[in-house]
Amino acid sequence: MHDKTWSGRFNEPVSELVKQYTASIGFDQRLAEWDIQGSLAHAQMLTRSGVLSENDLTDIRRGMSEILEEIRSGKIEWPLDLEDVHMNIERRLTDKIGDAGKRLHTGRSRNDQVATDIRLWLRDQITVIQNLIQNLQTALLDLAEQNAEAVMPGFTHLQVAQPVSFGHHMLAYVEMLGRDFERMTDCRKRVNRMPLGAAALAGTTYPIQREITAELLGFEQICQNSLDAVSDRDFAIEFTAAASLVMVHLSRLSEELILWMSPRFGFIDIADRFCTGSSIMPQKKNPDVPELVRGKSGRVIGHLIGLITLMKSQPLAYNKDNQEDKEPLFDTADTLIDTLRIYADMMRGVTVKPGNMRAAVMQGFATATDLADYLVKKGMPFRDAHEVVAQAVRHADEAGVDLSELPLEALQGFSKLISDDVYGVLTPEGSLNARNHLGGTAPEQVRLQVKRWREMSA
């Protein structure tokens, strides 16, 4: 008997170097449980279609149950000579149950088999990821609710722009993660299409009933073109793109946490368990976790580019190139899952420093726009108000004080429209409360948005 299922065509064995270079068992063995799921459904369909006997099905189920137990207990071996997870499991099954194991592959190719395995695996990973996204959102919502009144500088160009609520800032990331959740839901629709039954590329001559297999495996749709079914990796690229966006959002938050934790900002502190020290500088507390998230985002984005490049020049249908889809896909899911898990825990360990944040607001003329709006409401055209306030800011800057610290006489020197009610406008808290509309930064709006998100995820 040949050591490979296809070696009867060849006059010489494959070299050891080629075996090592082309084998995928080192990484695709993680698909084993999903491969068994697909095989059991395929066997049941073949039995109902009259291709396999009931005895064959009974033997296959028994053998697969034993193999699954070996996999979960770590007792199974994965010989390199058998190339991949599919051939390893088939050989193990045949060793256990004999000819019924050889019949299992009837009407099926590894091409549609592996495409099915990946989709089954990825479908489960998306479920895990979506649960973790919601868990992180909950951590951010808790922070937002606790700090709805905490005022901080909002930035544009990393320069102080206007006062915002820290809670409002956290809600911005809740919104981003909400879109990420939606993208995963949308991606799952295209992942959840069954290629099994396409065989190598043209379908099969056996009387298969793909609807039965799809129902058994929980696929909502069936791939309608056999060529496309075995060669499509759009779903993998789409998932990696969605995962890249999640990592981009977490990288942006990481950058802010790193800045805010630095003494130059001093807005927050991160719990010790997420930081490390220095081997030479005793005073150091380094935000390693957010820094590493920032770095790992590039890794996931790199996988996206790799998968796109992998597919760009392939003719129909299946090509060996596609073996290279698994490692970037696996690593993308692993990295994202690990990052989401640690991030939710880390955000629950963030300590906010409202006093430092408010002091920073007072150093950047953050209420200048509020003064301009004040003058507009008194009847001054906005462009004129903009110019007047710019002059007032320059004067305050030269005097080394905030706008709210200028005496009334000085402010009236820029416009007689200004009266003593202006000081209610120039405080950071007044600025927050004035923006009390849908999407605004007022504490009342922050609480309403927190409530809305909690109700949506309940």
Curated annotation (Swiss-Prot):
Gene3D superfamilies on file: Fumarase/aspartase (C-terminal domain), Fumarase/aspartase (Central domain), Fumarase/aspartase (N-terminal domain)
Keyword Transcription attributed: no
Location of the protein in the cell: Cytoplasm
SUPFAM superfamilies in UniProt: L-aspartase-like
PANTHER family named among the record's database cross-references: ARGININOSUCCINATE LYASE (PTHR43814:SF1)
Record family assignment: Belongs to the lyase 1 family. Argininosuccinate lyase subfamily.
Protein name from the UniProt record: Argininosuccinate lyase
